């Protein structure tokens, strides 16, 4: 730990010079401090998501009393202090457009930027902080059991009301790779996010980081011990801590930043004056807009392939501003500053360390990984059942049938209409008899318009006091699908019990299997409430982030409404998460098996309880392509069960688009085709025979790969791994992978290169160093009950030095490659996972040049709770070496004991084998292709018993 003292003033320059001659080390600190105030500039950036508001605008208002009063006696910035490189200027007018006079009154520099207006927004700020702008001072720094504590004091108020002039800093060195610090008001308790996080009681003995402090202006500098690289430097701009405006800025080690979801953007965010707003909102995915979820975590790549992450545990409305220096500023409207830094150093380690804090993903039931089908407009059980029958007749796998609002009585939760859905329970039981499952939409808003005694969920909720209330302590009433509605407060323990009861009572009528929780930002068709919102500081804060609609009440409920734990102002971004937790627990209680919840609104830690779909996407090629970075993004955030609506939800799809989307969707961790109310049909059987054949081929491939996908989810659940992952996660030292976001990996082994443009019969993808085998050379369909597609000639392997490769991609093909060095389990595909799980299995073995490969299979009954705690699972490792394949039985029980291994396909066998043995018994009917270097070995073995297969 080092403390950096402030640079000398001009008045003391001569004295400081003499002191510096005697204290060279101190001068070194000063010079380094001054250098870090202006981070080095890096050129190049990706397109802008959304730019910050201009600091100058014609017709801006004159300085108001707040500005004048706040800055009495403050010296103005002098020209030499304003000589700051444009890309390193931090905005002194984040709250509004201001004039030169207003900027001067704030003690800031005013230099109009050269670029002109872009609509209503601009790039670099015109009004910006000088390096001498007053900030907090570090005092009383001392060691603690966990790290350090200190007091931060400010003598000059800012231009925001209710500055907190004295703060407490706590720095906790929690683990070797995790640093945690908080900045709080020591005199008054402020809202903190009620997220369960690890509790550590002693400091890490050998951290991978060092911590330094700047005394005045206060700042925290975090370095990587290995190379001294600065990962966090908060001295680049003043710290703000007012009641409703908190700002913390830091330099960034590179421009390669990902995270800060949920937004429609490339995987790597632009650092070209990009504003990212976090305030959950019901809005069809639109560039530059705040969407359904808020995840204040970013992962930054560094030169050489190391990475680190930063998590601000804060649920208030906020902006995050990225600028080209590169640097980042957090701007929150409340709470505290609760910051975690994750040292990695590998990107996948950063993800795991983040999940150590927010929670590892839940383990989904096996059936949840099958194909799901839904549309708004299945208006009766007869129509819904006919869809299932059509899928079966056309030989399309289908595991889960869904219904949208159509099933409800007057669009009210926990009801079904007695017209089109009078035999609703019987339909669900019939699905179960066919080995399928059923899910339906459940919105959080509860109808409040009926007479007393007419609607039990509202009557009972009112009796138990479970609803969010207004300033008169009455339930806040908004409008959603059923009309006037109240909103459950899922932070209230009474609401959790009430929700469990409502779910259980409805499940007693209709034995559904999972819950689709929608509209839970929460969405509201009117602004605030039927009675409007109060005129107070929560509804009209001094700083409003760049939310669509311009106010915090837009498309949701009043910010000042009351919940059990705090105001909605503080808890809004947690609404979807708290409903997901309630629904997760309610399903466990009602069904006694593993819950399956898909939610639209999310927050950090969501993956511990539920999955996510990316909302109301358009049926367009642009949104097909943008779904790839979004799926990757949510995996990095610990929400691996994620997918976009296959073929799109808004607008009509086309046959080609739907084929390509089905091919990509076959590699979403969560795959659902969902259609809007008035659109043309987009069920797979609705298209031409060639299109159906292409879709069937993609679905068949997914079902064959389900044992591997399930194993990946197990690894995510127990070890914080990702399921779908960006290439840079596996190949961080190859900088060519860093911006690849139109391909994805499943785990370490499978590389998927989809076609994302219209009219294309080939596709170009990046292949990192290694051998990549075409998965289509592995025969899988013969294992199952579905008809095999016609074979097509393929290039069996790509030997890459790290290069872009153009691949043939006719309409019936999605390119999937198996990485050398890996073994994946396969299973015969059926029309349901119930059927597939009874089919024989196979192994695809992809050898390296040295003839080695490894893999894993995790297997259980697919839906029981606590299988790990009870030991009710089978786990098998596979190893290939020296022309031999063996399995290692890590854990074996009756679950998996009957899994039959019927075929082993070895890729990359260099020479023709003369003999193949299975447990010492010759295999006479093996086949080998000298052209493709593929060895197919028919066997009759059990996965859960030791075996040895060899060739020579």
Curated annotation (Swiss-Prot):
The UniProt GO MF terms for this protein read: alpha-1,4-glucosidase activity; carbohydrate binding
Prodomain residues:
28-69
Q: Which residues form the active site?
A: 518, 521
Disulfide linkages recorded for this protein, renumbered to the chain, are 82-109, 92-108, 103-127, 533-558, 647-658
**Residue numbers spanned by region Disordered:** 47-80
Q: Glycosylation positions? A: 140, 233, 390, 470, 652, 882, 925
Q: Does the keyword Zinc-finger apply?
A: no
Major location (coarse): other
Note the superkingdom of the native organism. Eukaryota
Keywords attached to this Swiss-Prot or TrEMBL record, sorted alphabetically, are: Disulfide bond, Glycoprotein, Glycosidase, Hydrolase, Lysosome, Membrane, Signal
Q: One Pfam family, short name please?
A: Gal_mutarotas_2
The UniProt entry, under InterPro entries, shows:
Gal_mutarotase_sf_dom, Glyco_hydro_31_AS, Glyco_hydro_31_C, Glyco_hydro_31_CS, Glyco_hydro_31_N_dom, Glyco_hydro_31_TIM, Glyco_hydro_b, Glycoside_hydrolase_SF
| CDD domains noted in UniProt | GH31_MGAM_SI_GAA, GH31_N, Trefoil
Enzyme Commission code: 3.2.1.20
The catalysed reaction is: Hydrolysis of terminal, non-reducing (1->4)-linked alpha-D-glucose residues with release of alpha-D-glucose
Kindly indicate whether the keyword Disulfide bond belongs to this entry.
yes
- Localization of this protein: Lysosome; Lysosome membrane
Q: Where is the P-type domain?
A: 80-131
- What PANTHER family would the database entry show? ALPHA-GLUCOSIDASE, LYSOSOMAL ALPHA-GLUCOSIDASE
Q: What does this protein do?
A: Essential for the degradation of glycogen in lysosomes. Has highest activity on alpha-1,4-linked glycosidic linkages, but can also hydrolyze alpha-1,6-linked glucans.
Regarding protein family, the annotation reads:
Belongs to the glycosyl hydrolase 31 family.
What name does the UniProt record give this protein? Lysosomal alpha-glucosidase
Gene coding for it:
GAA
């Amino acid at each position: 730990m080092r403390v950096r003292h402030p640079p000398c003033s001009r008045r003391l320059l001569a004295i400081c010079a003499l002191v510096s001659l005697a204290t060279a080390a101190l001068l070194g600190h000063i010079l380094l401090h001054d250098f870090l105030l202006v981070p080095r500039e890096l050129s190049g950036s990706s397109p802008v998501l959304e730019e910050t508001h201009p600091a100058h605008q014609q017709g801006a208002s004159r300085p108001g009393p707040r500005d004048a009063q706040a800055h009495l006696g403050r010296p103005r910035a002098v020209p030499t202090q304003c000589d700051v490189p444009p890309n390193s200027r931090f905005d002194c007018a984040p709250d509004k457009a201001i004039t030169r006079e207003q900027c001067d009154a704030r003690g800031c520099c005013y230099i109009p930027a050269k670029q002109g207006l872009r609509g209503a927004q601009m790039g670099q700020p015109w009004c910006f902080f000088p390096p001498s702008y007053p900030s907090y001072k570090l005092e009383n720094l001392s060691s603690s059991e966990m790290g350090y504590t200190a007091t931060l004091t400010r003598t000059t108020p800012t231009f925001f009301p209710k500055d907190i002039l004295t703060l407490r800093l706590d720095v906790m060195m929690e683990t070797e790779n995790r640093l945690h610090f908080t900045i709080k008001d020591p005199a008054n308790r402020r809202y903190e996010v009620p997220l369960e996080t690890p509790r550590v009681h002693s400091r890490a003995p050998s951290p991978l980081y060092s911590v330094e402090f700047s005394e005045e202006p206060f700042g925290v500098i975090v370095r990587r011990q290995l190379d001294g690289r600065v990962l966090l430097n908060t001295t680049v701009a003043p710290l703000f801590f007012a009641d409703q405006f908190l700002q913390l800025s830091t330099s960034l080690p590179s421009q390669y930043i990902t995270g800060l979801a949920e937004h429609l953007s490339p995987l790597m965010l632009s650092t070209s004056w990009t504003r990212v707003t976090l305030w959950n909102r019901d809005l069809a995915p639109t560039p530059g807009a705040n969407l359904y979820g808020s995840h204040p975590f970013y992962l930054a790549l560094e030169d050489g392939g190391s990475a680190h992450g930063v998590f601000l545990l804060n649920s208030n409305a906020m902006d995050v501003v990225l600028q080209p220096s590169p640097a980042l500023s957090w701007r929150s409207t409340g709470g505290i500053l609760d910051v975690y830094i994750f040292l990695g150093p590998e990107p996948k380690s950063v993800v795991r360390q983040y999940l150590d804090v927010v929670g590892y993903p839940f383990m989904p039931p096996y059936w949840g990984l099958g194909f799901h089908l839904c549309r708004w407009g299945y208006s009766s059980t007869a129509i819904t059942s006919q869809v299932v029958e059509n899928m079966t007749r056309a030989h399309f796998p289908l595991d889960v049938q869904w219904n949208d609002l159509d099933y409800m009585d007057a669009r009210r939760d926990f009801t079904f209409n007695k017209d089109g859905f009078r035999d609703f329970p019987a339909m669900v039981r019939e699905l179960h008899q066919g080995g399928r499952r059923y899910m339906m939409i459940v919105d959080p808003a509860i109808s409040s318009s009926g007479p007393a005694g007419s609607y039990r969920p509202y009557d009972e909720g009112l009796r138990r006091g479970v609803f969010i209330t207004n300033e008169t302590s009455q339930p806040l009433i908004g409008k959603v699908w059923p009309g006037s509605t109240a909103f459950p407060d899922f932070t209230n323990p009474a609401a959790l019990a009430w929700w469990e009861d409502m779910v259980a009572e409805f499940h007693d009528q209709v034995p559904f299997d999972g819950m689709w929780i929608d509209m839970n930002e929460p969405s509201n068709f009117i602004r605030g409430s039927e009675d409007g919102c109060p005129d107070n500081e929560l509804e009209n804060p001094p700083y409003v982030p760049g939310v669509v609609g311009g106010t915090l009440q837009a498309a949701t409920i009043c910010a000042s409404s009351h919940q059990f734990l705090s105001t909605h102002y503080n808890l809004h971004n947690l609404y979807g998460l708290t409903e997901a937790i309630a629904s997760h627990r309610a399903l466990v209680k009602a069904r006694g098996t593993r819950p399956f919840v898909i939610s639209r609104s999310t927050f950090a830690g969501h993956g511990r309880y539920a999955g996510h779909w990316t909302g109301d996407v358009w049926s367009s090629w642009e949104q097909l392509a943008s779904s790839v970075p979004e799926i990757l993004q949510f995996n990095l955030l610990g929400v691996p069960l994620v997918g976009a609506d296959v073929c799109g939800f808004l607008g009509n799809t086309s046959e080609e688009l739907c084929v390509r989307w089905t091919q990509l969707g076959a590699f979403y961790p969560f795959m659902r085709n969902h259609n809007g109310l008035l659109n043309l049909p987009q069920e797979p059987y609705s298209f031409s025979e060639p299109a159906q054949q292409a879709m069937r081929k993609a679905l068949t491939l997914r079902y064959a790969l389900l044992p591997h996908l399930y194993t990946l989810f197990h690894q995510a659940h127990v070890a914080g791994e990702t399921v779908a992952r960006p290439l840079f996660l596996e190949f961080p030292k190859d900088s060519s992978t860093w911006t690849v976001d139109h391909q994805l990996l499943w785990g370490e082994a499978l590389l998927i290169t989809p076609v994302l443009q219209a009219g294309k019969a080939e596709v170009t993808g990046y292949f990192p160093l290694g051998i990549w085998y075409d998965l289509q050379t592995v025969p899988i369909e013969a294992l199952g009950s579905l008809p095999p597609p016609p074979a097509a000639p393929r290039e069996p392997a790509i030997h890459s030095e790290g290069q872009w490769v153009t691949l043939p991609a006719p309409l019936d093909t999605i390119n999937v490659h198996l990485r050398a060095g890996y073994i994946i389990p396969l299973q015969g595909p059926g029309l349901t996972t119930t059927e597939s799980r009874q089919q024989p299995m196979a192994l695809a073995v992809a050898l390296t040049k040295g003839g080695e490969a490894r893999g894993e299979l995790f297997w259980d009954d697919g839906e029981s709770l606590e299988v790990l705690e009870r030991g009710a699972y089978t786990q098998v490792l596979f190893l290939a070496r020296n022309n031999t394949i063996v399995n290692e039985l890590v854990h074996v029980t009756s679950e998996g004991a009957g899994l039959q291994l019927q075929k082993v396909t070895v890729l990359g066998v260099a020479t023709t084998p003369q003999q193949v043995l299975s447990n010492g018994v010759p295999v006479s009917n093996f086949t080998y292709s000298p052209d493709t270097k593929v060895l197919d070995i028919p066997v009759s073995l059990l996965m859960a018993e030791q075996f040895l297969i060899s060739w020579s």
